[in-house]
Regions:
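Short connector loops at helix/strand junctions that flank enzyme active sites
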Residues: 45-49, 56-60, 91-93
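Acidic-basic catalytic patches of nuclease active cores, encompassing PD-(D/E)XK
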Residues: 1-43
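Nucleic-acid nuclease catalytic cores
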Residues: 87-117
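Mg2+/Mn2+-dependent nuclease catalytic core
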Residues: 66-92
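Short acidic (Asp/Glu) patches
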Residues: 39, 45-49, 78-86
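Short, basic, glycine/proline-bearing loop/turn elements
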Residues: 32-38, 64-72
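Non-catalytic C-terminal interaction segments of nucleic acid-processing enzymes
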Residues: 8, 27-33, 40, 47-50, ...
Length: 169
């Protein structure tokens, strides 16, 4: 899915819709294959934050790409340090979310941080350790549009409308 996202964000940049960067995971190389100039063994330096950060029409965004093969997403796949980073990002005025691929269904969803926070809190209070496909809002279904394989800007716009309505209430 990350290749599809990378392709989409390259097109967003080409069309001046967004500037989004893939954040590399910090590693320490241990073994190198000099003949092929490849790292063959490495360790993670520290916990990474999210997969992508950028700006869309003046709005800072950060998000992670996740995939699951069943109709439920185990929250253990979303680490506490990632949730903390997304929360702090939102407190600074940004928008945080994940793009979740249900590979068995061939569908992708934009899941806003506030919904992730609800599911995470439910888990911490002794509830389910996952959330189901049918708990997600259909308005946040991410569909391909022409060459935009993971066209999430429409879902982001829906999220912005929801946030604006929440702020007015």
């Amino acid at each position: 899915m990350e290749e599809e996202i990378n392709h989409t964000i390259a097109l967003y940049e080409e069309k001046n819709l967004a500037l989004i960067q893939k954040i590399p995971t910090p590693i320490t190389p241990i073994k190198l294959d000099q003949s092929h100039k490849q790292i063959t063994l490495a360790y993670f330096d520290k916990k990474s934050t999210v997969d992508y950060m950028g700006i869309v029409q003046g709005i800072p965004i950060c998000f992670d790409a996740k995939e699951c093969h069943k109709d439920s997403f185990p929250l253990q796949n979303l680490h506490a340090h990632q949730m903390d980073f997304m929360k702090r990002f939102m407190l600074q005025g940004g928008i945080s979310f994940i793009i979740l691929s249900f590979s068995k269904r061939g569908e992708k969803y934009y899941v806003p941080y506030r919904e992730l926070e609800y599911f995470y809190q439910r888990m911490e209070e002794g509830g389910k350790k996952s959330f189901r496909y049918d708990e997600l809002r259909e308005a946040f279904l991410v569909e391909a549009k022409k060459d935009l394989l993971v066209h999430f800007l429409e879902a982001l716009n829906q999220d912005i409308l929801c946030l604006n309505n929440m702020n007015k209430a």
